[in-house]
């Protein structure tokens, strides 16, 4: 044994030192690490908002530093608003200029963004007054708004005397378009493989369960038409069914009589419960915008809205509200408003109130207005508050509200002439800024309408915190 070991050691010693070193290097050499890559992409998420101001002449005189605000709009995950100052923002200018600013209206810190403000030419010539950051290089980069309430804009946006004799003002109306580009950065990593996941098919599976009636354990009798269903499915979807079925034990197959619903409505209700979708007839139902009185209530979507309220199905309610919202018109809004109030459809009610306020004179002259006054007197004050732009209780109590409502509802040719006085009555002497009718139109995408000859380098632009 010793001689063998000695021989092996001798052989090792006889190896060439260079060969031995090369062999050791190969034995201990680590593989080189793989090369990876990543890409940082900085870009802007753009969105536009159009702000129409009706009643410019009434807006003048509200005071220096006081503004009219647009509705808020969302771009890049933040909310924004346009502030228009009819008498200017800077006391030193003595109301010689109008001011326009873009304000960060939601919580956020150090929001970096680009802006564009356009005062639209209403003559059709397309000579808009445009202040834009998008088409030129910024030496110091995008603007940074530090926190909620920070603003960017112009104290001297336009000389007021020139504005009032220009094509930017038409029919006592101004139109301002704003584009915001929020700066975002993200890492773009290459993905070598991807697997597509199809949309959920659970609705189709439960739908087959409803159609085949497999395992059904309850029967609904609706005006002589029978519907088989499954108590567990109904209970899982509706708290009303849950309390009715799961609190009762030891019962076999049951028959339930439904006396307050038509068969087609109950069928649409089950279709939603099992498939989480509106039945096709409900999606296309419409009162065609020309009806008054109760006809809007006769649509399948309207009746299904009542079923959603009865069985506490908020998602179904929103689906029906979305369908009915598309049918709002001057003639139908009063009835749809009453319907929304009856069935606790808050989103639809809000849209109806806003539409009625923006089209008040035309709505007052419709037969639907009489229907609203006769059948839903409790909605009177709510509509008046919306018209006045008040979020708080009206001062003066109900007597004042009824007095104003009487002035509105008597119709006739004098309604338009009485309009400014009535708004003042509603506000109880509040600031005249509330007497301006504001129409807001949201638009996704850039929505820009530039004229290169009117772009300016905006040396007077200001950033305020």
UniProtKB/Swiss-Prot annotation:
Residues of the MATH domain: 46-180
Gene Ontology terms: biological process: cellular response to salt stress; cellular response to water deprivation; protein ubiquitination; response to osmotic stress
CDD domains found in the cross-reference section: BACK_AtBPM-like, BTB_POZ_BPM_plant, MATH
Domain BTB: 216-282
Tissue specificity: Ubiquitous.
Pathway(s) of this molecule: Protein modification; protein ubiquitination
Domain of life, source organism: Eukaryota
Induction of its expression: By drought.
Region Disordered, residue ranges: 12-40, 395-429, 441-465
A Pfam family hit: BTB
Protein family: Belongs to the Tdpoz family.
Subunit composition and interactions: Interacts with RAP2-4. Binds to MYB56 at the promoter of FLOWERING LOCUS T (FT).
UniProt protein name: BTB/POZ and MATH domain-containing protein 4
Organism: Arabidopsis thaliana
